[in-house]
Curated annotation (Swiss-Prot):
Organism of origin: Aquarana catesbeiana
Residue ranges of every copy of the Beta/gamma crystallin 'Greek key' domain listed in the record: 2-40, 41-83, 91-131, 132-174
An example molecular function term from Gene Ontology annotations: structural constituent of eye lens
PANTHER family: BETA/GAMMA CRYSTALLIN, GAMMA-CRYSTALLIN D
A family per Pfam: Crystall
Function noted in UniProt: Crystallins are the dominant structural components of the vertebrate eye lens.
Family as reported in the entry's similarity comment: Belongs to the beta/gamma-crystallin family.
Protein name from the UniProt record: Gamma-crystallin M1-2
Gene3D superfamilies attached to this UniProt entry: Crystallins
Domain of life assignment: Eukaryota
Residues passing through the membrane, by range: none
Lineage: Eukaryota, Metazoa, Chordata, Craniata, Vertebrata
Region (Connecting peptide): 84-90
């Protein structure tokens, strides 16, 4: 079972709210969030209610100055616990240079710290997650905006929540939850 604690002040001070399940609307529980402690599991937190807006992946650990380390201006508005069995088994991802799974395709079984080095493009317009869960990052070396991809077909970049096709890196969510 997962457990995440949101604190109103930095360094785990002030009023706190503990959560062990998905929560589509955190706003009634605290006024601000300046630090987070993940005691169990892996979580995606979202900048807007109902799992909308920018996403941020948090694994077990402490985030004493949450807004600074995540580059956020606002408190998280919703949170989702990722499965404890996430990433067990194989991981397979196909990426495409054009929408609707068209154009040049590459298949990945491992993390990719720099998409351009492997795919010769900064853009992925569609993809198919065949096995496992993956996180796309806007910038190389696992930085920038994050997008969680579950198994399934993503016909265009908007399907995974992005406003652009720019993907700088991606990694498997494996063995860390």
């Amino acid at each position: 079972m997962g457990k995440i604690i949101f604190y109103e002040d930095r360094n785990f001070q002030g009023r706190s709210y503990e959560c062990s399940n998905d929560n589509p609307d955190l706003q009634p529980n605290f006024n601000a969030c300046n630090s987070v402690r993940v005691e169990n599991g892996c979580w995606m937190i979202y900048e807007r209610p109902n799992y909308m807006g920018h996403q941020y992946f948090l694994k077990r650990g402490e985030y004493p100055d949450y807004q600074q380390c995540q580059g956020l201006n606002d408190s998280p508005q919703s949170s989702r616990l990722l499965s404890q069995n996430l990433g067990i088994g194989t991981n397979k991802l196909r990426v495409y240079e054009r929408g609707d799974s068209k154009g040049e395709m590459m298949e990945f079984l491992e993390d990719c710290p720099n998409v351009y080095d492997r795919f010769c493009s900064h853009e992925i317009h569609s993809c198919n997650v065949l096995d496992g869960y993956w996180i796309f990052y806007e910038l190389p070396n696992y930085k920038g905006k994050q997008y969680l991809l579950r198994p399934g077909e993503y016909k265009r970049f908007t399907d995974w929540g992005s406003q652009t096709a720019k993907v700088g890196s991606f990694r498997r969510v494996i063995g860390i939850c």
